[in-house]
Amino acid sequence: MKPLNIIFAGTPDFAARHLQALINSHHNVIAVYTQPDRPAGRGKKLTASPVKELALSHSIPVYQPGSLRKEPAQQELASLNADIMVVVAYGLILPKVVLDTPRLGCINVHGSILPRWRGAAPIQRALWAGDKETGVTIMQMDVGLDTGDMLLKTYLPIEDDDTSASLYEKLALQGPDALLQALEGLANGTLAAEKQDETLANYAEKLSKEEARLDWTKSATQLWQEVRAFNPWPVSYFEHQGNTIKVWQTQVSTTSSTAAPGTIINASKKGIDVSTGDGVLTLLSMQLPGKKPLSVADILNARGEWFTPNTRLNNEAQ
């Protein structure tokens, strides 16, 4: 297969994994587009994206326009004469003139099985909803939000111990192989595009810190799903004794309770059992303010008086 001249557009580490795969392939990455450097860390020092750092380490030209809606930026991109543009978590809207510029258009690596979970947080929303599988879709981009024709899909079962962090890692391994396979099919003309079924589409909204507050009136199963979805960000939490306590790991208990939602049923080094709107949730790992995440056994050693049976959590809001 003849090598393709590729423009790569992406920003975070997930995108950098895909760029590395392209660099390692026989294709030519002729330019990289990434978000402008942003202030980061305590010193708010301007910091390059992982994609920019990787590109510069391989002497690949880097472009960082604040927008691709203006003609000078569009002309600059067109002058590169790329065969195709590969977009992975770039973070900028591509107008139609940009989508139509490369000979083979623009393709996107998306972290869900489209048309389910279009949008910004597909990995997290799959966990949040209790989905049994996720995957990667390689899509021909159009002007809609993740609405383009699907070129290739891979599938990944979601395990009970998966979190957003672990799924992110698994999809970051699966995605690059799918991308290379799709590029080969496009170059050879052997890929058959599949339209998305709009009746199956839904939207993966961004997560918010407010959403991560545990609502004990929900079912234990839903709360377990949320804790996994919000790990490592924004991390589920509840308020107690005037403090915000983060929850990193839970499991659904086999015990039952008629106590009011948010009531501690039992507290031992194996876990803290909390009554919910349906079932009992066992807290396994938590984080006190200013501290590192700890097992419940260590939490009880430090603050056992906070978590005695019959105590109500989030009681300030009830």
Swiss-Prot record:
Q: Which GO terms describe its biological process?
A: conversion of methionyl-tRNA to N-formyl-methionyl-tRNA
Q: Does the keyword Transferase apply?
A: yes
Which residues does the annotation say bind (6S)-5,6,7,8-tetrahydrofolate?
S112, I113, L114, P115
GO MF annotations for this entry?
Answer: methionyl-tRNA formyltransferase activity
EC number(s) reported in the record? 2.1.2.9
- The superkingdom of the source organism is Bacteria
The catalytic activity, as recorded, is:
L-methionyl-tRNA(fMet) + (6R)-10-formyltetrahydrofolate = N-formyl-L-methionyl-tRNA(fMet) + (6S)-5,6,7,8-tetrahydrofolate + H(+)
Family to which this protein belongs: Belongs to the Fmt family.
Entry-linked NCBIfam families: fmt
The name on file for this protein is: Methionyl-tRNA formyltransferase
Please name the source species. Shewanella oneidensis (strain ATCC 700550 / JCM 31522 / CIP 106686 / LMG 19005 / NCIMB 14063 / MR-1)
